[in-house]
């Protein structure tokens, strides 16, 4: 995983765990046919698209008392 860099991704979230959960949930939504929020190559995989969306600020999260919502 070279693009986007982990350093840039970590600027958008508070922990690596949050990053993994956020990317996984967004990738799952992409697999279920939601449209990508960024322009990427057609050969890009859902997790790669999700990471690009996170670093571009297109996907965000809010910390709930009981976990990520």
UniProtKB/Swiss-Prot annotation:
InterPro entries for this protein: DNA-dir_RNA_pol_omega (IPR003716), Pol_omega/Rpo6/RPB6 (IPR006110), RPB6/omega-like_sf (IPR036161)
GO biological process per UniProt: DNA-templated transcription
Protein's name according to its UniProt entry: DNA-directed RNA polymerase subunit omega
Keywords: DNA-directed RNA polymerase, Nucleotidyltransferase, Transcription, Transferase
Gene Ontology MF term list: DNA binding; DNA-directed RNA polymerase activity
Native organism: Heliobacterium modesticaldum (strain ATCC 51547 / Ice1)
Coiled-coil zones: none
Family: Belongs to the RNA polymerase subunit omega family.
């Amino acid at each position: 995983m070279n693009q986007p860099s982990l350093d840039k991704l970590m600027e958008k979230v508070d922990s690596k765990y949050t990053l993994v959960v956020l990317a996984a949930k967004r990738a799952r939504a992409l697999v279920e046919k939601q449209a990508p929020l960024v322009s990427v190559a057609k050969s890009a995989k859902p997790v790669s698209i999700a990471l690009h969306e996170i670093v571009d600020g297109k996907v965000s999260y809010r910390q709930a008392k009981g976990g990520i919502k």
